[in-house]
């Protein structure tokens, strides 16, 4: 099943919007590329809704939060929900209250991040 999912992903090569932190931006872009998709890293609140609208999915990594990126994350998450795009919060346990108004379709976390 996972093999089929990756084959489907690679055949479509979707553009994936990533709002990540400064520590992992390169790693996140490389992971998206390794899965067969194309990353775009955009976190300015003035553009995130437009960027999310042209992408096939949204990845939000909240490793180092700040007020600017939190605003961008919430705007992008709401837009992804409106469009029915899949999206994912990484390191979600500390921010469950933030996720409540914009529920993600996928949540990821590591034991070391909890």
Q: How would you name each of these model-derived features?
A:
Residues 1-41:
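Glycine-rich phosphate/adenosyl-contacting loop at the front of the ribokinase-like
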Residues 22, 45, 93:
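Residue-level "edge-of-site" marker
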Residues 40-49:
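Active-site-flanking structural segment that lines cofactor/substrate pockets
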Residues 48-114:
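Glycine-rich phosphate/dinucleotide-binding loop and adjoining beta-alpha-beta core of small-molecule
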